[in-house]
Amino acid sequence: MTKEEFYLACEKNNLFLSEIQKKQLYTYFELLVETNKVMNLTGIVEENEVYEKHFYDSLLFSFCLPLEDKSLVDVGTGAGFPGLVLAICYPLLKVSLVEPLTKRCNFLNKVIDELELTNVEVINSRSEDLSSLREKFDYATARAVARLNILCEIIAPLLKVNGTFIALKGKQGEEELLEASNALKKLNLSIEKIQKVNLLTDNDERINIFLKLDQKIDAKYPRNFSQIKKKPL
């Protein structure tokens, strides 16, 4: 997917990027590739692949939601996918990027400073240590972090009631959703939408799962991460 194909795909979904935003995305790409030479950020560094498998993939779910004047937390953001891409493309969205590795946080802050973004913050923390952020967000995202039954317990407590958790998954998404049925019940989550999309170039399937928090969660969740991992809900 060339840059021009990326812009056109966004426009087809009513996302019209300014020249400044286009330049910010390209600078992000350049910083990603340059930093990746000395730090393991991604296995994808070719320009067309970054635009499709990182940038476009990060935006797919956003075409289904109103993001203006909302808050979003991206858990286990890594090199900033999807959260930093969303912050660039939706300047009225307030984004919090959660990442446990300090060196990745340093990279994210470098990009944010370089692009002069004012709607995004980096939180250097494990996702299960975010009690101060409980019930703070309209949306939460996670991409390629863990299986869904584990993610639900970590992420659901961060949502406001009626907030939405979007799990960005590949072709195994529906299998993970079945596996997470008990977790959804215990955490007051319901399936709002399942978005199935194929990437334009290599036809890779993406399954984005939208889970709505219907009411407050029992204060005992999330449990200690070792418990979550050892015995998922």
Task: Name each region found by the language model.
Residues 45, 124-125, 193-195:
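Short loop/edge segments at beta-strand edges and connector loops
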Residues 104-106, 173, 177:
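Short alpha-helix immediately C-terminal to the canonical SAM-binding loop
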Residues 90, 159-161:
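Helix-to-beta-strand junctions that scaffold the AdoMet/dcAdoMet cofactor pocket
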